[in-house]
Curated annotation (Swiss-Prot):
The modification Phosphothreonine is found at residue 839. Residues 809-850 are cytoplasmic. Gene3D superfamilies: Zona pellucida, ZP-C domain, Zona pellucida, ZP-N domain. The gene is Tgfbr3. This is Transforming growth factor beta receptor type 3. Residues 735-749 are annotated as: Interaction with TGF-beta ligand. The lineage of its organism: Eukaryota, Metazoa, Chordata, Craniata, Vertebrata. InterPro entries: ZP-C, ZP-C_dom, ZP-N, ZP_chr, ZP_dom, ZP_dom_CS. Glycans are attached at residues 143, 491, 533, 544, 570, 589, 696. It comes from Mus musculus. It is found in: Cell membrane; Secreted; Secreted, Extracellular space, Extracellular matrix.
């Protein structure tokens, strides 16, 4: 025993040493309990609905549109009544930019503050907001508020009275919507010719153009494993179903909303989200007022919000090796280096999650990510250092390159003009780095690359300091613009990239009535020709937290950059002359539309969801309304997918790069329609295909991408229009790239109707219903076939009768020897008696003789 105890002492000492050196190991034990308000992740159900309403095209011939919102009080007992409403205004799908004056009647049971947010509504157009007494309207855009007026009115409260009041005042009403007070109301302005001529209020008014958003908290369970906030946090969110319908196959977006738990101080995090759902969903990540790095891991598709909804530098990683249980998922996170796990949340039903982050007080102020000094050139003149050397010709004071650079030739300028005005609304691009090759899943926070941008009315030139580029470990990397063919040139000190204003992937938007902001990006990637991804791990890609492009940016648009680091830059110019050689993306004077029809007559489009069965024809008509007669369009791609997101491609391709891929595709000729408006015309393209049910789901989506082209001569902005036959043989990569810059995607839902087997579902056809028999039972036989069958049956019957008579006549002698009748019955047929008598003459004489 003494020996045993003597050897046990070192064992205990060794165990104690191991525990002491290991430190506090992150716990993977999670005791699930219902979450409270203090839990960092909250589950919610977002719904969109209205009480009643209507829409019409009655204001088409009038000088203004009229939209009415009649708000009702919410249920009492839910706390303080709501005092603020955000009104989101966008054009309808068939209108790219809305230019018509509008009157909004905003009636509410209590005074409200209306926050108006607009997208693609032209500036300088008069708009009138009539509000209830005590309500005010606030505008987020300064240009929009210059021509917007607000007046207080006393409105009738009942729907019909309010509608009649507006019709009497303005002649007609474009839309009327009754809804409960909500935080967010979404109204799409514009007039569609498919609307009825008058507005008749209905209870079951459902339209994607007029909706209110409601958020309802949902029950969830979870645990918090780290009580104190850290610089790095890992949150695991598991969702059972995005809706309460267990049979729904519609892929929905699950929104993760990330914000600080308190307004200040500023929150800086290295955040990891591990997302899991048993059904196929699309995770949409939105971050507000949180700086740092965000990594999202999920087995499904991952998207991100608009540029204004991306405050963090984000990385996404698709992993399909998730374990099934909660304990194993926690262990999986630790085994893959995602530790310590901060929280775990599981929700039975939800379509939105709010993640609220606490500030890490231990982080020092100098660790807050700021814009590098080299990029202050993009902030504006107040942030720029003074140059030691005088500016060269045409250069902005304090805004030129930090190295000698030859003058850029400029055409169309007069001597002494202000050649490059300062941008009125400078935009700060967010900068990203390539991941470290040793740790490809990490994204670095700051960047020290000297970047200078210069532009004139012909081109943009961006220069990257070679020393700062190589100092940060990017030696041997390749620099291009968004168009990979636009590569950097080198001089002694800098990489120089040059782009015309209408090429190399450059986009633009109007920042003021006389200003244009041009955007492009520097793509940093390995020049290896054998590996198209450039990543050690092919699934991970990097997206800019704010790419500077207007509108939504989806996965399809960022896919070409998913393998590279991206540095976004921009330049603002005053539009001295009408730009030649380019037009707004999907020209503002061109409006696209797509409709589905049941027949090849293309008379009445199918409203709502289009019903289709196996082997049935689907007739598609796409059109463009335009003013330029030389402007044409093409159907670039059409495919059917079980997903509503057009960026998720499928194998069921109908048309690809204008060339038909489905053998059943048939094109139809159509005439060009001229409008009474001067120089306005409508071009149409029609085609059909035979639907094949290749997906095991009842709801599918037809996605078609349309692109502009030039009828006469192709340019760098627009390719020359080609026929489908030519596209199948002569389309090259340059034309495809140009088409992608001017595409517009339309989506139409398809309801798959299954063919019913009558024998299985209707066992007794006569008793259950008078439905006629299934069509395969002689339903399609013509008259000649039926007569042939009847004649054949008659011949067969005659032959059978003759055969029976032959058998009977040859067996009659034996039967009569057994029994000879003395006289025929009186009831026998005379012909039968005559026949029998004639056959018995000889036997009778023989019998009498015997």
């Amino acid at each position: 025993m003494a020996v045993t105890s003597h050897h046990m002492v070192p064992v205990f000492v060794l165990m104690s040493a191991c525990l002491a050196t290991a430190g506090p190991e992150p716990s993977t034990r999670c005791e699930l309990s219902p979450i409270s308000a203090s839990h960092p992740v909250q589950a919610l159900m977002e719904s969109f609905t209205v009480l009643s309403g209507c829409a019409s095209r009655g204001t088409t011939g009038l000088p203004r549109e009229v939209h009415i919102l009649n708000l009702r009080s919410t249920d009492q007992g839910l706390g303080q009544p709501q005092r603020e409403v955000t009104l989101h205004l966008n054009p309808i799908a068939s209108v790219h930019t809305h230019h018509k004056p509008v009157v909004f009647l905003l009636n509410s049971p209590q005074p409200l503050v209306w926050h108006v947010k607009t997208e693609r509504l032209a500036a300088g157009v008069p708009r009138l907001f009539l509000v209830s007494e005590g309500s005010v309207v606030q505008f987020s855009s300064g240009n929009f508020s210059l021509t917007a007026e607000t007046e207080e009115r006393s409105f009738p409260q009942e729907n019909e009275h309010l509608l009649h009041w507006a019709q009497k005042e303005y002649g007609a009403v474009t839309s009327f919507t009754e809804l409960k007070i909500a935080r967010n109301i979404y109204i799409k302005v514009g007039e569609d010719q498919v609307f009825p001529p008058t507005c008749n209020i209905g209870k079951n008014f459902l339209s994607l153009n007029y909706l209110a958003e409601y958020l309802q908290p949902k029950a969830a369970e979870g645990c918090v494993l780290a009580s104190q906030p850290h610089e790095k946090e890992v949150h695991i969110i598991e969702l059972i179903s995005p809706n309460s319908n267990p049979y729904s196959t519609f892929q929905v977006d699950i929104i993760i909303d990330i914000r600080p738990a308190r307004e200040d101080p500023e929150v800086v995090k290295n955040l990891v989200l591990i997302l899991k759902c048993k059904k196929s969903v699309n995770w949409v990540i939105k971050s507000f007022d949180v700086k740092g790095n965000l990594k999202v891991i999920a087995p499904d598709s991952i998207g991100f919000g608009k540029e204004s909804e991306r405050s963090m530098t984000v990385t996404k990683l698709v992993r399909n090796d998730y374990p099934s249980t909660q304990e194993n998922l926690m262990k999986w996170a630790l085994d893959n280096g995602y530790s310590p796990v901060t929280s775990y949340t599981i929700a039975p039903v939800a379509n939105r999650f709010h993640l609220r982050l606490e500030n890490n007080e231990e982080m020092r102020d100098e660790e807050v990510h700021t814009i590098p000094p080299e990029l202050r050139i993009l902030l504006g003149p107040d942030h720029l250092p003074a140059l030691d050397s005088p500016p060269f010709q045409g250069e902005i004071p304090n805004g030129g390159f930090p190295f000698p650079f030859p003058d850029i030739p400029r055409r169309g300028w007069k001597e002494g003009e202000d050649r490059i005005p300062r941008p009125k609304e400078p935009i700060i691009p967010r900068v990203q780095l390539l991941p470290d090759h040793r740790e490809p899943e990490e994204v670095q926070g700051g960047v020290n690359i000297a970047l200078s941008v210069k532009c004139d009315n012909e081109k943009m030139v961006v220069a990257v300091d070679k020393d700062s580029f190589q100092t940060n470990g990017y030696s041997g990397m390749e620099l291009t613009l968004l168009d990979p063919s636009c590569k950097a040139k080198m001089n002694g000190t800098h990489f120089v990239l040059e782009s015309p204003l209408n090429g190399c992937g450059t986009r633009h938007r109007r920042s003021a009535p006389d200003g244009v902001v041009y955007y492009n990006s520097i793509v940093v990637q390995a020049p290896s020709p054998g590996d198209s991804s450039g990543w050690p791990d092919g699934y991970e890609d990097l997206e800019s937290g704010d790419n500077g492009f207007p509108g939504d940016t989806d996965e399809g648009e960022t896919a070409p950059l998913s393998r590279a680091g991206v540095v976004v830059f921009n330049c603002s110019l005053r539009q001295l002359r009408s730009p030649s050689g380019f037009q707004d993306q999907l020209d503002g004077n061109a409006t696209f539309n797509m409709e589905l029809y049941n027949t090849d007559l293309f008379l009445v489009p199918s409203p709502g969801v289009f019903s289709v069965a196996e082997n049935e024809h689907v007739y598609v008509e796409v059109s463009v309304t335009k003013a330029d007669q030389d402007l044409g369009f093409a159907i670039q791609t059409c495919f059917i997918s079980p997903y509503s997101n057009p960026d998720r491609m499928s194998d069921y391709t109908i048309i690809e790069n204008i060339c038909p891929k489905d053998d059943s595709v048939k094109f139809y000729s159509s005439k060009r329609v001229h409008f009474p408006i001067p120089h306005a015309e409508v071009d149409k393209k029609r085609f059909s295909f035979v639907f094949k049910s290749v997906f095991n789901t009842s709801l599918l989506f037809l996605h078609c991408e349309l692109t502009l082209c030039s009828r006469n001569k192709g340019s760098q902005k627009l390719p020359k229009c080609v026929t489908p036959d030519d596209a199948c043989t002569s389309l090259d990569a340059t034309m495809i790239w140009t088409m992608m810059q001017n595409k517009k995607t339309f989506t139409k839902p398809l309801a798959v109707v299954l063919q019913v087997d009558y024998k299985e579902n209707v066992p007794n056809m006569k008793e259950s219903s008078p439905v006629p028999p299934p069509p395969q039972i002689f339903h399609g036989l013509d008259t000649l076939t039926v007569m042939g069958i009847a004649f054949a049956a008659f011949v067969i019957g005659a032959l059978l009768t003759g055969a029976l008579w032959y058998i009977y006549s040859h067996t009659g002698e034996t039967a009569r020897r057994q029994q000879v009748p003395t006289s025929p019955p009186a009831s026998e047929n005379s012909s039968a008696a005559h026949s029998i008598g004639s056959t018995q003459s000889t036997p009778c004489s023989s019998s009498s003789t015997a």
